[in-house]
Amino acid sequence: MAETWVSEIMTQALGCLQAFSSEFALEWESSDMKAAIFKLLLGWIVLSLTAILLAWKSYGPTVNSIYYRQGMGGQNGGTPEYPARFPVWESSSTESLKRHQE
């Protein structure tokens, strides 16, 4: 089922590309350059956004799993509050604080 969906999209995309290129060729011959350049830039933007969308659909979950790592690192891959190899030193109320004396 996925193959038919992809092939249908590719067929439509190729049809649009063929129509766009034939229209562009006709405008090029008639020297209507403003319209041709506008359509070329518009096509480039649409193509770029489509490529970004397809890349995000393909690699989006991987990027999210890297960005939002689970575990000791906290959110967004930060450092843990207390490194695992160093002990946590907690001061008790009976312990006096050391002060610098001159």
Swiss-Prot record:
InterPro entries, alphabetized: TCTA
Listed name of the protein: T-cell leukemia translocation-altered gene protein homolog
Swiss-Prot/TrEMBL keywords: Membrane, Transmembrane, Transmembrane helix
Keyword Transmembrane: yes
GO cellular component entries: membrane
Similarity comment: Belongs to the TCTA family.
Name of one Pfam family that matches: T_cell_tran_alt
Mode of membrane association: Single-pass membrane protein
Transmembrane regions: 36-56
Coiled-coil region list: none
Main subcellular location: membrane
Gene name tied to this protein: tcta
Highest rank taxon of the organism: Eukaryota
Compartments reported by the entry: Membrane
BP term (GO), one: osteoclast fusion
